[in-house]
UniProtKB/Swiss-Prot annotation:
Binds directly to 23S rRNA. The L1 stalk is quite mobile in the ribosome, and is involved in E site tRNA release. Protein L1 is also a translational repressor protein, it controls the translation of the L11 operon by binding to its mRNA. GO terms for molecular function: rRNA binding; tRNA binding. Belongs to the universal ribosomal protein uL1 family. PANTHER family: 54S RIBOSOMAL PROTEIN L1, MITOCHONDRIAL (PTHR36427), LARGE RIBOSOMAL SUBUNIT PROTEIN UL1M (PTHR36427:SF3). The keyword Ribonucleoprotein applies. One of its GO terms (cellular component) is ribonucleoprotein complex. This is Large ribosomal subunit protein uL1. Part of the 50S ribosomal subunit. It comes from Streptomyces lavendulae. Keywords: Repressor, Ribonucleoprotein, Ribosomal protein, RNA-binding, rRNA-binding, Translation regulation, tRNA-binding. The keyword tRNA processing does not apply.
Length: 64
């Protein structure tokens, strides 16, 4: 499937080998967005905890 000019330009801005800082990643996500509505971004963190143990449960939300 052929990709549009907009998607190719957005893909060229992202270096897939680089680890981005959180602020830079959010800026890049907003800059390369092709939608005309507020999109959702999911972030996953590896915390190294055992979710089966009640004292190690981690939950929360963040507003950007």
């Amino acid at each position: 499937m052929k990709r549009s000019k907009t998607l190719r330009a957005a893909d060229a801005k992202v270096d897939r080998e680089k680890l981005y800082a959180p602020l830079e990643a959010v800026r890049l996500a907003k800059e390369t967005s092709t939608t005309k509505f507020d999109a959702t971004v999911e972030v996953a963190f590896r915390l190294g905890v055992d979710p089966r143990k009640a004292d190690q449960m981690v939950r929360g939300t963040v507003n950007l």
